[in-house]
Swiss-Prot record:
It comes from the Eukaryota. Its main location: membrane. PROSITE patterns: EF_HAND_2 (PS50222). Each of the two internal repeats contains five hydrophobic transmembrane segments (S1, S2, S3, S5, S6) and one positively charged transmembrane segment (S4). S4 segments probably represent the voltage-sensor and are characterized by a series of positively charged amino acids. Belongs to the calcium channel alpha-1 subunit (TC 1.A.1.11) family. Two pore calcium channel subfamily. Residues 1-67, 147-161, 203-208, 308-431, 492-503, 550-560, 676-735 are cytoplasmic. It comes from Nicotiana tabacum (Common tobacco). This is Two pore calcium channel protein 1A. Residues 249-263, 619-633 dip into the membrane without crossing it. The chain crosses the membrane at residues 68-88, 126-146, 162-182, 184-202, 209-229, 287-307, 432-452, 471-491, 504-524, 532-549, 561-581, 655-675. Glycans are attached at residue 460. The gene is TPC1A.
Length: 735
């Protein structure tokens, strides 16, 4: 789950040494117990924000605990895959309503308007749950082995996990009895718990929900004020239109008026709801125009402002807490090295620490040539001594991507051939700008070919076959490009670049796909028609986006886009989890109601708008339906239709609560965050241009100006820039 902050091998660290460190190397180093190794472990903990608790590092069994911890982290990918599998199980699990004694079996998918994903049988579902439960138990309880029970149970998060695990086990036992036909099971809590475990064990998601929990009080206050506005406006509308056509046809009661005015607050039924009044008198439009202006452009934006202000306050607390934890951890590392309590470190001590940091998987490889640069970076006072405040900048300094010499390609094993005049000339050509211009030209020609081939495909023109062959030819040109780059730079250096990784995967899939297309029998439609390879070739056109980075007016927009994607992932993931909760609830409340045999279905707006496929009969359809409601596309159709099908007004509570949480709260939060983050990124881009225009000699002395940041560093840097004034106030209040 972790990755290097700095890719590549250092120039003096040995050409043949593996760039990627081994967990066993770190475990063995820490197990042998020097102060510098413990300090390096603490710095690593400060860098990634996770790892061994500080209390363990002071214990007598630190080495054993660290060894068990590293064994645990070796399976990070497996743990992540298991939590993903827990969520995926919801999509394939057979809904409980299908187990009722139905007139028509759930196997008739058309009858119930079900999706296309297959259902797991009871036995298959139980096996799936059993395997994921076993891995879940191991992941939750294994930390006891290196933390100890007392320290483990002291954590509120661990206690919550254990309690939820016991509830999940009980739910599975009850489900087994249900499969044995002991009784009918109307409700399962497992679908909700799977998503909860997913949230609790994905740190970014967990932090997002903690922020939302801190905002809840402020949000409820502003929602209460909005509710007062809605109640008063609805009462005014009910009284005002009592004796008009509007009152006799639409605003027939206060409850009905309140419902219609609430939907109008979201503009989903505008202007349909006030057409009767408009027919009576054109002047009646003033009432509704004023209501929409106040509701949509004032109250809603007021909610947006309050939500984001509260969000920033909670985010500042979270970022400040992480900074304080980072500082406390670095202080421990500092004290371990400063055994004489001098209050400072000299260059030799820092050098020994950096040598230990070279063994860590989440920290960069630092060469001897870089030690002096980093030491100068930290030594703000210029006294050749590093105090605690200067040492606190260590994680930032060592996280920089210093320019390094490339590691040796494997072809250096044949120096006579690799360094021959022809080879040197070829490699020089590949490194040059001309080669990149040729590739860009090929991409542009490929784009034209794709457009022509796609147009002919739409027209069912036989000339499409020729252009498909042309596209296949382009695929092999990319193979040649990849081979030349690997030959020139070496595979390790080639793999460092994210674009190269994307090209490598797509290119090899194209090669394998083209081969399969030509050798596959005609009966295998998917392989033999070659259509799917075209979409991979189109995906390669995404490389053209990089051209926008060379256009000054677009650079800030493109850079902001790529920075905002990882910044927004936790909040988009939060919305996804909310959708999962509501989807599970929707299946249990509304599952099976929409079916061909329901006589009340034809009179609903679901049937009238041809929305029958958007239902809550299975998990995939439910998620798509909730997405449609999320984007506010005729969302009142589902609310009113399910109210009519269930026969109870309590149905409104489901849809209104979803609107309040997902649309009015979370989507507003994302909109505000994007606006603020974009402005911060534009400021950073402007600052970077100013730095680039400074004295080049000074820039070469401070090598950080030529570095780049990893994704997590960019997000962290962006957040600190966005919250710089609030963080300053927070640090002044809590010195």
């Amino acid at each position: 789950m972790e990755e290097y902050l700095l890719s590549g091998e250092s120039s003096n660290s040995g050409r043949t040494r593996r760039r990627i460190g081994s967990i066993f190397d770190r475990r063995d180093a820490i197990a042998h117990g020097s102060a510098y190794q413990k300090a390096a472990a603490l710095v690593d903990l400060a860098e990634d924000g996770i790892g061994l608790p500080e209390e363990i590092l002071e214990g007598a069994s630190f080495e054993k605990a660290a060894e068990l911890y590293f064994i645990f982290t070796r399976f990070d990918f497996l743990w992540s895959l298991n939590y993903l599998a827990l969520v995926v199980l919801n999509f394939f699990e057979k809904p409980l309503w299908c187990s009722k004694h139905l007139a028509e079996s759930c196997n008739n998918r058309d009858y119930y308007y079900l999706g296309e994903l297959p259902f797991l049988t009871g036995a298959e579902s139980l096996i799936f749950e059993g395997v994921t439960l076993l891995l879940l138990i191991i992941h939750i309880l294994f930390p006891i082995s290196y933390e100890g029970f007392n320290l483990y149970w002291r954590s509120l998060l661990n206690r919550v996990k254990v309690i939820l695990l016991l509830i999940l086990v009980a739910d599975i036992v009850v489900y087994i009895l249900f499969l044995a036909d002991f009784y009918y099971l109307p409700f399962r809590i497992a679908p909700y718990l799977r998503v909860v475990f997913f949230i609790l064990n994905i740190r970014e998601l967990r932090d997002s929900f903690f922020i939302l929990a801190g905002m809840l009080g402020t949000y409820l206050n502003v929602v209460a004020l909005s509710a007062l506005f809605l109640l008063f406006s609805s009462w005014l509308a009910y009284v005002f239109f009592e004796d008009t056509r509007q009152g006799k046809t639409t605003f027939t009661s206060y409850g009905t008026t309140l419902y219609q005015m609430f939907v109008l607050f979201t503009t989903s039924n505008n202007p349909d709801v006030w057409i009767p009044a408009y027919k009576d008198s054109r002047w009646y439009c003033l009432f509704f125009v004023l209501y929409v202006l106040l509701g949509v452009y004032f109250v809603t934006n007021l909610i947006l402002a309050v939500v984001y202000d509260s969000f920033k306050s909670e985010l500042v607390k979270q970022v400040a807490d992480k900074d304080r934890l980072r500082l406390r951890t670095l202080k421990k590392a500092f004290s371990l090295i400063d055994e004489a309590n001098n209050g400072h470190l000299n260059e030799k001590q820092c050098t020994l620490l950096f040598e230990e940091l070279n063994k860590y998987r989440t920290l960069p490889k630092i060469s001897g040539d870089d030690f002096k640069s980093i030491f100068s970076e930290l030594d703000d006072t210029g006294d050749f001594k590093i105090n605690l405040d200067e040492f606190a900048d260590l994680c930032t300094a060592i996280g920089l991507r210093f320019q390094k010499e490339d590691s040796l390609p494997i072809f250096e094993a044949c120096p006579n051939f690799y360094h021959s005049p022809a080879s040197e000339k070829l490699r020089g050509f590949v490194r040059g700008a001309t080669f990149e211009y040729i590739i860009v030209f090929v991409l542009l020609v490929n784009l034209v070919a794709v457009i022509i081939e796609t147009t002919l495909d739409i027209q069912n023109n036989s000339g499409q076959t020729f252009w498909q062959k042309v596209e296949f030819t382009f695929g092999w040109l990319y193979v040649i490009e990849m081979a030349l780059k690997v030959y020139t730079y070496g595979f390790e250096n080639y793999w460092r670049d994210g674009q190269n990784r994307f090209d490598f995967v797509v290119t090899w899939v194209i090669v394998i796909g083209e081969t399969a297309t030509f050798v596959a029998p005609d009966g295998l439609t998917f392989l033999s028609n070659g259509e799917w390879i075209r979409y991979l070739l189109i995906a390669r056109m995404l490389r053209l986006i990089r051209l926008l980075m060379h256009v000054e007016r677009y650079r800030a927009f493109v850079a902001t886009f790529f920075t905002l994607i990882p910044s927004l992932v936790p909040y988009l993931g939060t919305i996804f989890c909310i959708l999962c909760f509501y989807c599970s609830l929707g299946l249990q409340i509304f599952g099976g109601i929409v079916n061909t045999g329901n006589p009340n279905l034809a009179q609903t707006d679901l049937a009238g708008n041809d929305y029958l496929l958007f239902n809550f009969n299975d998990y995939p359809n439910g998620m798509v339906t909730l997405f449609n409601i999320l984007v506010m596309g005729n969302w009142q159709v589902w609310m009113q239709s399910y109210k009519e099908l269930t026969g109870t007004a309590w149905t409104y509570a489901y849809f209104v609560s979803f609107y309040l949480i997902s649309v009015l709260w979370l989507l507003n939060l994302i909109v505000a965050f994007v606006l603020e983050a974009f402005q911060a990124e534009v400021d950073l881009e402007a600052s970077a241009r100013c730095v680039d225009g400074d004295d080049k000699e000074a820039k070469s002395e401070r090598r950080r100006n030529v570095g780049t940041k990893t994704r997590s560093q960019r997000v962290d840097f962006l957040l600190h820039h966005m919250l710089r004034s609030e963080l300053t106030e927070c640090s002044n209040e809590n010195p």
